[in-house]
């Protein structure tokens, strides 16, 4: 007869199995896609989703929660929305977007999520940071006092920029806004070669909504000039979806913050925030948020202010690092009173205004000195620059005024004629070719000659000023490099006497050629 198992034995076996069961239930916050429209998905469920949380769809595509309702969530898709279908399961990650940061990203081209899109292989960064972080507080900051040299004469002399400043570059399309930013990045090459690690300026160039061919030209130019080795390029091109264009500047800022928070210096260029605002407007309207002025949502100011406020010069206790921001805004027919331009002007510490009329006249970079200002940069100017630049702005303003006045009358007194003649020389001296930044001591030399040795400069014809400028700087670099080097410090009488003698001899030789 077979042995029978009684009920108590069965109960004991079940109890033992239950107690030794080591596969705990995994709880997941999931939802279901209700609708997909132009990169925006409406998801039912996700009860514990957080604003800004990263989610993943069944196809592997990721998204970000940007709208929360009673029982639904609005999610922007970070990729192709064709891979997302109604009824798909959506899972919350429990985390917000992070991007890789560190020296490993230098020389690389990445997308808005920090993934490489060049041919350099995988980025093995040791650190990651959240793309959304609080701006440094008042106590953690220090006033701007160190110069950031752009290599552009009209900016370094008249609209100086300091490390930790936010300086807006604004103007119509195709008049040199990006060129100023790229020149500034290229100019750091010589400076970085001469200083230690903590004094180097690392750069981040963020391309938002631009053609891929345009970005490729910029990357090639940086590579040719040797500037890509200390630069990271973040790209969200015109072919990328609106959410990627929206995230790109925050990613670029986060990459720059790594250097700032570790006692180093970084320059971030946002090219441009007009397209960034358009991408955010598109997302907001699709999320059915109420439109405001020019159909932008009510929080468009906050979107830009929370980005630009992260640029700062840190205090001694926080490592003395800095993050400098050069946002770019494109205007329509020179209208700076539009919604987004006025917002960004009010957020930043000054603006460099480029004018189409000056550009077409051949005055390049086409900076309108009357409308351009740097509110904190003067505190960071070198003493020698302050001495020579003091009268330049006044001379330029007088020339512009007298130029219009001279059109109405032919009889001009000697003083007016002298101011007009000096203005013509100054205009030629302030012109600069694309991708040819100039060191600060060379700028000081040229402006000192204009301000104090006009009698010598006047011997050169206006049409020959550009050739005179190039030959003079080459002469100083090869024959008198010591004198040129001293001009980056304070200027004393001995240096002035040396310059007078050298320039007098050079002008004589130049006119004989």
From Swiss-Prot:
Keywords: ATP synthesis, ATP-binding, Cell membrane, CF(1), Hydrogen ion transport, Ion transport, Membrane, Nucleotide-binding, Translocase, Transport
InterPro entries to which the protein is assigned, alphabetical: ATP_synth_asu-like_sf, ATP_synth_asu_C, ATP_synth_asu_C_sf, ATP_synth_F1_a_nt-bd_dom, ATP_synth_F1_asu, ATPase_a/bsu_AS, ATPase_F1/V1/A1_a/bsu_N, ATPase_F1/V1/A1_a/bsu_N_sf
GO cellular component: plasma membrane; proton-transporting ATP synthase complex
EC number: 7.1.2.2
Entry-linked PROSITE patterns: ATPASE_ALPHA_BETA
EC top class named in words: translocase
A family per Pfam: ATP-synt_ab_N
Protein name: ATP synthase subunit alpha
UniProt subcellular location: Cell membrane
Record GO terms (molecular function): ADP binding; ATP binding; proton-transporting ATP synthase activity, rotational mechanism
Organism: Wolbachia pipientis subsp. Culex pipiens (strain wPip)
Residues that bind ATP: 171-178
Membrane disposition: Peripheral membrane protein
Site (Required for activity): 372
Top-rank taxon, per record: Bacteria
PANTHER family: ATP SYNTHASE SUBUNIT ALPHA, MITOCHONDRIAL
Main location: membrane
Gene name, Swiss-Prot/TrEMBL: atpA
Oligomer and partners: F-type ATPases have 2 components, CF(1) - the catalytic core - and CF(0) - the membrane proton channel. CF(1) has five subunits: alpha(3), beta(3), gamma(1), delta(1), epsilon(1). CF(0) has three main subunits: a(1), b(2) and c(9-12). The alpha and beta chains form an alternating ring which encloses part of the gamma chain. CF(1) is attached to CF(0) by a central stalk formed by the gamma and epsilon chains, while a peripheral stalk is formed by the delta and b chains.
